[in-house]
Design a protein with these regions (language model features):
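Hydrophobic anchor at the beta1->P-loop junction of P-loop NTPases
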Residues: 7-9
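P-loop (Walker A) phosphate-binding loop of NTP-binding proteins
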Residues: 12
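ATP-binding Walker
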Residues: 15
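Walker A/P-loop
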Residues: 18
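N-terminal phosphate/diphosphate-binding loop that engages ATP/GTP or pyrophosphate donors
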Residues: 27-93
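Small-molecule kinase domains that catalyze NTP-dependent phosphoryl transfer to phosphate-bearing small molecules
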Residues: 71, 116-123, 131-140, 166-215
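ATP-dependent NMP and nucleoside kinases share a basic, alpha-helical "lid"
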Residues: 87-165
């Protein structure tokens, strides 16, 4: 059954999914699920406890202690685990790499799938941001969007994001990692990064954040 209270935003990193989700939530008053943060949470806990044994990592996760909220200082969406804001720990490249490694494991995807599905009845509606939200996690969503952008633009956005965090970056290396991850994500056997058949594909390369939000609002209200 189609659910008109679920909107999914899929696409690779750096296309503006998180910003769009936040802006739509402001406009619609809906709850946000940033699924990528959940995978980065697993990567962070792996690094913190020096283990790649997912069974051990699972024991560190209290399902009741996972929630998202807006950060008023930088307008980002923060992931909390047991009242600890993980935002500053899960955004570095080492954690992102570990998150990608865990994301291909069926046991990890199955575990996080259940957590993500648990968000569907929270609030007035749900905006789910990820890579397989419209294809796997919420196939019943009425509104499905898939964002794209050039690798150059995505690398530029990531560079700005890292610089804001005080980190030095190499633009060429960033772009190479983006292209490498795209290839891995789109060709993996489990939940490949592809648009849902009924998703609307939008290239965000030349769209401002509010232009993108207005475009999506116009579509869902038409």
């Amino acid at each position: 059954m189609i659910d008109p209270k679920i909107l999914t935003i899929d696409g690779p990193s750096g296309v503006g999914k998180g910003t769009l989700a936040k802006n739509l939530a402001d406009e619609l008053g809906w709850t946000v699920l940033d699924s990528g943060s959940l995978y980065r949470m697993v990567g962070y806990l792996s690094l913190k406890h020096n283990t790649k044994d997912f069974f051990k990592i699972r024991k560190k996760i209290n399902l009741e202690g996972i929630y998202f909220k807006f950060n008023d200082q930088n307008s980002n969406i923060s992931l909390f685990l047991e009242e600890e804001d993980l935002s500053n720990f899960i955004r570095n490249e080492e954690v992102a790499k570990l998150a990608s490694e865990f994301a291909v494991l069926p046991e990890v995807r199955d575990y996080l799938f259940k957590i993500q599905r648990g968000f569907r009845h929270k609030g007035k509606g749900l905006i789910a941001d990820g890579r397989d939200m419209g294809t796997v996690v919420f196939p019943e969503a009425k509104y499905k969007f898939f964002l794209t952008a050039s690798s150059e633009e995505r690398a530029r956005r990531r560079e700005n994001q890292l610089k804001e965090s005080g980190l030095s970056v190499n633009m060429r290396n960033l772009q190479e990692r983006i292209m490498e991850r795209d290839n891995k994500d789109s060709s993996r056997e489990i939940s490949p990064l592809i648009p849902a058949e009924d998703a609307i594909v939008i290239d965000s390369s030349n769209l401002g954040i509010y232009e993108l939000k207005d475009k999506v609002i116009e579509i869902i209200r038409s």
